[in-house]
């Protein structure tokens, strides 16, 4: 059994009295030193299950110290194309668990350098944005977001290919959609407008991305995040009923007028009164 395990530190056994057995003779030492080393020949172990490539990097992200094992890293790179045989669900589960590690930066850089990341996520790129995001958020979805460019369709396509949960796919797409409206120089009114149009989570995720791009602006980013997460999105204060009272028949004109009202209401930072007058002015604009 030990000879077919993936890593030497996974080939440890204990009896009912707590005595540890280490058939490879290296498992205990590996665990103590943070070494992730395949049992026997790395390529043989990988060919038994190509998911072991991702497990190598996932275990390293969580438990590894020092440089990744050179032989294991080389074998992962050499056999990376074999991961195309894996189900998307198995791949995405390993990737998200890796990204949830306290500090996955070295593991992700090693994956990219070995050509493994490109096999599972060719759209992704590690670099300063991802590295900064790891220090700002422990959320694996925020970290994954910073591997992608700001492109909603690309993000959706990649998420669908990986068969990420619908909630994760939709969250990534919403953040990409909100990103053009979000920046660290936003006014408070701009933040409220963005939250109203894009929802709190999407704006907060986009702000994390902007913060990772400009980590020196931490104080401003924190303030904007607190505002976005603390502001309660108000309901639209008027609807078709109010327009009907002004003589507007249901139909396309109703939608146009409500959209015009909403745009003005947002631009004025969500005033709480004067709605009837504003709506009446849209229905019967002043002449002159």
Predicted stretch roles:
Residues 81-219:
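Conserved, hydrophobic alpha-helical core segments of structured domains
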Residues 73, 108, 169-177, 222-225, ...:
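Short, well-structured alpha-helical segments
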Residues 26-32, 71-80, 87-90:
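Short, conserved phosphate-binding/catalytic loop or strand-edge motifs used
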Residues 2, 49, 56, 107, ...:
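A residue-level signal for conserved active-site and pocket-lining positions in enzyme catalytic cores
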Residues 19-38, 210-288:
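Charged substrate- and nucleic-acid-binding regions of tRNA-handling and nucleotidyl-transfer enzymes
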Residues 54-61, 99, 112, 258-262:
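Short, amphipathic alpha-helical segments that act as regulatory/interfacial helices
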Residues 46-50, 85, 101, 229, ...:
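Conserved phosphate/pyrophosphate-binding and hydrolysis machinery centered on Walker-type P-loop NTPases
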Residues 1-71:
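Acidic, glycine- and histidine-enriched catalytic cores of nucleic acid- and nucleotide-handling enzymes
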């Amino acid at each position: 059994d030990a000879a077919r395990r993936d890593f030497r530190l996974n080939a440890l056994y204990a009896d009912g009295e707590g005595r540890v057995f280490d058939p490879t003779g290296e498992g205990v030492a590996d665990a103590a030193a943070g070494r992730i080393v395949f049992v026997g020949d790395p390529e043989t172990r990988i060919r038994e299950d190509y998911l072991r490539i991702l497990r190598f990097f996932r275990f390293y992200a969580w438990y590894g110290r020092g440089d990744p094992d050179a032989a294991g890293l080389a074998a992962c790179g050499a056999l990376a194309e074999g991961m195309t045989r894996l189900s998307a669900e198995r791949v995405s589960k390993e990737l998200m668990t890796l990204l949830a590690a306290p500090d996955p930066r070295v593991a992700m850089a090693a994956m990219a350098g070995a050509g493994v990341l490109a096999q599972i996520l060719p759209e992704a790129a590690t670099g300063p944005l991802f590295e900064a995001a790891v220090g700002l958020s422990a959320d694996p979805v925020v970290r994954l977001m910073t591997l992608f460019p700001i492109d909603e369709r690309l993000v959706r396509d990649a998420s669908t290919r990986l068969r990420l949960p619908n909630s994760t796919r939709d969250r990534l797409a919403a953040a990409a959609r909100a990103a053009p409206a979000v920046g660290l120089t936003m006014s408070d009114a701009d933040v409220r407008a963005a939250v109203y149009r894009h929802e709190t989570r999407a704006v907060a995720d986009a702000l994390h991305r902007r913060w990772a791009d400009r980590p020196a602006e931490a104080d401003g980013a924190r303030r904007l995040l607190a505002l976005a997460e603390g502001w309660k999105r108000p309901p639209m204060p008027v609807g078709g009923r109010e327009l009907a009272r002004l003589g507007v028949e249901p139909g396309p004109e109703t939608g146009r007028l409500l959209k015009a009202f909403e745009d003005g209401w947002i631009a004025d930072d969500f005033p709480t009164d004067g709605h009837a007058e504003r709506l009446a002015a849209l229905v019967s604009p002043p002449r002159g």
